[in-house]
Amino acid sequence: MSIALDMDASAKMRKQPGSSGWSTSSTPSCSVIVPAFRENLNLRPLVTRLSSAFASQSSSELANTEIIIVDDNSRDGSVETVSALQSEGYNVRIIVRTSERGLSSAVVRGFREARGQRMICMDADLQHPPEAVPSLLLALNGQKSFVLGTRYGVGVSMDKDWPLHRRIISSGARMLARPLTSASDPMSGFFGITKHSFHTADHHINAQGFKIALDLLVKSGVHSTDIAEVPFSFGLRQEGESKLDGKVMFKYLQQLVELYRFRFGTVPIVFVLIVLLVLALYIWSHVLAPMLGA
């Protein structure tokens, strides 16, 4: 069950945009999907920064972009914040899910309800810079059907200040996905896809999976030449708490097994060997090293 808070089309047409300056057309050409849980404090800065980013572009298509917040029944004032933003003329709506949970299924729900032919997924915590969204959308306006915001592009490094063991784990995680896709950052949650490519993958998507971008990269069947990459710097969380915990790596490995079977029908031995190495590093860094005071 879910509750959608959305102004009716006629009301949108009568509403004069406030500081947003967005088009209020009922048929947006682009959609930005934002899965959220207890992110109320970040919603206003997210929407207003997106508005400013679109306003700085000369593209009329970008001006006609909708934002869809898919909220897992946070009850933290998110609905009221979106309602206030709507009254100010921002093209934003919220879907409140009362019986479903999880980031991947929230993204899938948003993509299914999006009216734009070009769709972007981004986090609500402002670690994905709203100012980079126009570049991702423009990258889909051509021959590309998938665009990935990468933290490993030229001049960008997310993990340069990480400890050695964490950098090795990060590199190992990307290495494990290499046979599945040539994308430099398949674990990124900042990505875009065309409606057509999403529909190709929709019946095969694991909505309970972990990394939805990787799932879509594999199951939409996009060729490496159809993937664009836009480097971005991974920002600091502005409000709220990080939802990462020690289970994320194991969820990722479970997803990789499912994707290898989907793509190749089997799991190669090299995958098992790298998994054992990554697990050994994880156990050392999170269990043994703290016990030994290393």
Swiss-Prot record:
It catalyses: a di-trans,poly-cis-dolichyl phosphate + GDP-alpha-D-mannose = a di-trans,poly-cis-dolichyl beta-D-mannosyl phosphate + GDP. The chain crosses the membrane at residues 264-284. It is an enzyme of class 2 (transferase). Gene3D superfamilies: Spore Coat Polysaccharide Biosynthesis Protein SpsA, Chain A. Residues 285-294 are lumenal. GO terms for molecular function: dolichyl-phosphate beta-D-mannosyltransferase activity; metal ion binding. PANTHER family: DOLICHOL-PHOSPHATE MANNOSYLTRANSFERASE SUBUNIT 1 (PTHR43398:SF1). Residues 17-27 have a biased composition (Low complexity). Its cofactor is Mg(2+); Mn(2+); Ca(2+). Mn(2+) binds at residues 125, 127. It is found in: Endoplasmic reticulum membrane. The lineage of its organism: Eukaryota, Fungi, Dikarya, Basidiomycota, Ustilaginomycotina. InterPro entries: DPM1-like, Glyco_trans_2-like, Nucleotide-diphossugar_trans. Its EC number is 2.4.1.83. Binds 1 divalent metal cation. GDP-alpha-D-mannose binds at residues 35, 39, 70, 72, 123-125, 127, 151, 211, 237, 243. Belongs to the glycosyltransferase 2 family. Residues 1-263 are cytoplasmic. This is Dolichol-phosphate mannosyltransferase. Its main location: endoplasmic reticulum. Transfers mannose from GDP-mannose to dolichol monophosphate to form dolichol phosphate mannose (Dol-P-Man) which is the mannosyl donor in pathways leading to N-glycosylation, glycosyl phosphatidylinositol membrane anchoring, and O-mannosylation of proteins. Pathway: Protein modification; protein glycosylation.
